[in-house]
Curated annotation (Swiss-Prot):
Protein name per its UniProtKB record: ATP-dependent dethiobiotin synthetase BioD
This protein's pathway: Cofactor biosynthesis; biotin biosynthesis; biotin from 7,8-diaminononanoate: step 1/2
UniProt binding sites for substrate: 40
Organism name: Methanococcus aeolicus (strain ATCC BAA-1280 / DSM 17508 / OCM 812 / Nankai-3)
Catalysed reactions, as listed in the record: (7R,8S)-7,8-diammoniononanoate + CO2 + ATP = (4R,5S)-dethiobiotin + ADP + phosphate + 3 H(+)
Length: 212
């Protein structure tokens, strides 16, 4: 299993999860499942992966905590008077982990987004589920700081960081010296860049690193 997290919201976690899931299921014939423990702002991410991987579970199994408002989970849960139940998340996790040979778990927002007001963060959910992590990052200016902070935060929680996948939301040609940016993340973060995604059909990802 792998936990797909990111340096921020909107960085492309769902997009990258879809690419990884489709490759593992349809090109490597690995029985691959998906779990989105918490989704704020609708059910679109979960529905996208359910369709892409042709999963037969109901959406409430794939996404046990669904919040209507596109806000931090702790805020959305408070506004909607809907306490986040870790037991329900664990039930879905156990069911899916036992059914599938490989489970993709996708986070919401970044690693330090609060799930509860008691300082239970998204990174604590990763620890709770016992999963290693992959960080989805972007190539643009500012990404070095965001990526290195994310790596440090995860490692301080004892989470194994398997690598970073760069999701090119913008064309790489428009990013100045992106090779040096990637090299800086690699060297300063002591982490492998295991993938670069240009679009849904053009990507270079070390899938062995993900499943190994």
């Amino acid at each position: 299993m792998i936990f797909i997290t990111g340096t921020d919201t909107g960085v492309g976690k769902t997009f990258v999860s879809k690419i990884i899931g489709k490759h593992l299921k349809y090109k490597e014939n690995i029985n691959t499942g998906y779990l989105k423990p918490i989704e704020s702002g609708g059910i679109e991410d979960t529905a996208t992966l359910k369709e892409a991987l042709n999963l037969d579970e109901n959406l409430n199994i794939l996404n046990p905590v669904n919040l209507k408002n596109p806000l931090s989970p702790n805020i959305a849960a408070e506004i909607e008077n809907k306490p986040i139940d870790l037991v329900e998340i664990k039930k879905s996790f156990d069911l899916l982990k036992n059914k599938y040979d490989f489970l993709i778990i996708e986070g919401a927002g970044g690693v330090a987004v609060p799930i509860k007001y008691n300082s239970f963060l998204m990174s604590d959910l990763i620890v709770y589920l016992g999963a290693p992590a992959i960080i989805v990052s972007r190539p643009d200016l500012g990404t070095i700081n965001h990526t290195l902070l994310t790596i440090e935060h995860l490692r301080n929680k004892g989470i194994l960081v398997k690598g970073v996948i760069i999701n090119c939301i913008n064309e790489l040609d428009t990013v100045l010296h992106y090779e040096k940016t990637f090299e800086t993340i690699n060297r300063c973060g002591n982490v492998e860049i295991i993938g670069i995604v240009k679009n849904e059909n053009e990507y270079n990802i070390n899938f062995d690193k993900i499943i190994g």
